[in-house]
Amino acid sequence: MTPNGKPAIRLSLRAGERIFINGAVLRADRKVSLELLNDATFLLENHVLQPEDTTTPLRQLYFAAQMMLIEPAMREQAHSTFAQMLKGMFSTFKDAEILNALKLVDELVHNGRIFEALKTIRAQYPREAELMGLESPVLPVAATRKSAEANP
């Protein structure tokens, strides 16, 4: 339990794996477990989307949101980009499931819960792929394992 009464977040990293915490990039030199005892903004390396992977509207939105987490110096610019993209998506997407998720994402980001917004966006990748006639993306096993460990 953390000092503020919330449960601690436990993370397990493999040797060489990186994690972004409050804008800092940390690399584990060996297998390690971390316990976050207070509110911290973090993103696991396998959830970091690279620019070349922003091939769909939701992935582009995810990238803008992730930049708010991992580049604090660019937070305002990333938020502005995110807001513009989100506004465009509300007029582009007609699918109720995605529109409801986008409304939730907007609310989460507005309340500073960017990590949860990222999870919500990722959860819509298969639906977006289906609507676009693309092969549904599969989350790597390692990412699934880490997500479960990070969110008991």
Swiss-Prot record:
One of its GO terms (biological process) is negative regulation of bacterial-type flagellum assembly. InterPro entries: Flagellum_FlbT. One of its GO terms (molecular function) is mRNA 5'-UTR binding. Pfam families: FlbT (PF07378). Keywords: Bacterial flagellum biogenesis, Repressor, RNA-binding. Signal peptide: none annotated. Belongs to the FlbT family. Has a post-transcriptional repressor function in flagellum biogenesis. Associates with the 5'-UTR of fljK mRNA and promotes its degradation. This is Probable flagellum biosynthesis repressor protein FlbT. It comes from Brucella anthropi (strain ATCC 49188 / DSM 6882 / CCUG 24695 / JCM 21032 / LMG 3331 / NBRC 15819 / NCTC 12168 / Alc 37). The gene is flbT.
